[in-house]
């Protein structure tokens, strides 16, 4: 029971912080309770703890609550020393600069993909997401790329046990069809989705390993623009893949 309570408290803390991000302004205890679907008494205890640790402060006017910059300082300290991003960031930035499209870096976490980095494109109309967002393996291009890194038997076993919900009318929901697609994509060296996760978005990706970690990197944008620039984008993506592989070789050679 104690373990379950600790997990619930951790989840509520994250919900509270995300509520402030969505509200973009101070919130009262009543507003917090409504937004995170939690009793006011529990919210009060949570806010008092965060206040004591310096993560939120209370405004005298209407007793509203807002996070301090301590959270930002902690997050920045963590981000500065990310074992993967600090090494990959320059290559990702160059990829976005050369294509103008949104660049995604992701890693498989059991039955889904988590975005480790998102560098939004420079176009007015672009694909948007955030680091920490999760996507299904079967309907995201990085999901497919990371599936492609697995041994065939291991991949088949994973696909057999995970759900394959239809996210859009274009989502591949047949297990055999998905496995066949992954096999073909792995053989040619790149992966794609066309409106499978978001109806009007296309993404192409490649996979690579660095420091023994399997990752996927993708370019994503509107289907029309991605199709028009497909050859150039894929060539640039393969260049980034080669740069990642060279970086990994330099680490292994030490």
Can you describe what each PLM-predicted range is?
Residues 1-81, 85, 242, 246, ...:
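N-terminal helix-turn-helix
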Residues 6-10, 29, 64, 68, ...:
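Short, structured helix-loop boundary elements
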Residues 35, 46, 87-98, 104, ...:
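Amphipathic alpha-helical regulatory segments at dimerization interfaces
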Residues 56-58, 105-106, 208:
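A structural signal for short hydrophobic beta-strand segments in well-ordered beta-sheet cores
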Residues 62-161:
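Amphipathic alpha-helical effector-binding/dimerization core
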Residues 167-168, 199:
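Intrinsically disordered, low-complexity polar/acidic regions
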Residues 174-243:
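Extended hydrophobic
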């Amino acid at each position: 029971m104690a373990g379950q309570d600790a997990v619930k408290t951790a989840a509520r803390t994250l919900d509270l912080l995300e509520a402030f991000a969505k509200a973009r302004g101070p919130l009262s205890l009543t507003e917090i309770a409504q937004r995170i679907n939690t009793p006011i008494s529990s919210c009060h205890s949570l806010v008092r703890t965060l206040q004591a640790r310096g993560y939120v402060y209370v405004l005298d006017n209407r007793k509203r609550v807002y996070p301090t910059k301590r959270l930002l300082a902690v997050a920045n300290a963590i981000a500065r020393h990310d074992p993967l991003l600090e090494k990959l960031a320059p290559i990702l930035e160059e990829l976005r600069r050369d294509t103008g499209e949104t660049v995604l870096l992701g890693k498989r976490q059991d039955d889904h993909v988590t975005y480790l980095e998102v560098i939004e494109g420079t176009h007015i109309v672009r694909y948007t997401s955030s680091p920490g967002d999760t996507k299904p393996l079967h309907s995201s291009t990085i999901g497919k790329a990371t599936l492609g890194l697995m041994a065939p038997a291991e991949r088949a076993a994973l696909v057999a046990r995970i759900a394959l919900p239809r996210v859009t009318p274009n989502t591949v929901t047949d297990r055999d069809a998905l496995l066949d697609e992954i096999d073909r994509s792995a053989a040619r060296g790149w992966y794609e989705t066309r409106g499978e996760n978001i109806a009007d978005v296309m993404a192409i990706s490649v996979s690579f390993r660095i420091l023994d970690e399997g990752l996927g990197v993708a370019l994503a944008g509107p289907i029309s623009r991605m199709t028009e620039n497909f050859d150039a984008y894929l060539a640039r993506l393969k260049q980034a893949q080669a740069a990642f592989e060279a970086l990994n070789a330099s680490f292994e050679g030490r």
